[in-house]
Amino acid sequence: HVGGDECNINEHRSLVAIFVFTEFF
């Protein structure tokens, strides 16, 4: 993304949420 660190952080959190979700469910 071309949007800065904040955008990257949001994407990272989304990926982490997906990984956690798939781990427990």
Swiss-Prot record:
Cellular component, GO annotation: extracellular region
Tissue: Expressed by the venom gland.
Domain Peptidase S1, chain residue ranges per copy: 1-25
Gene Ontology biological process terms in this record: proteolysis
Primary role: Cleaves a kininogen analog to release bradykinin.
Oligomer and partners: Monomer.
Family: Belongs to the peptidase S1 family. Snake venom subfamily.
Protein name: Kallikrein-like EII
Organism: Crotalus atrox
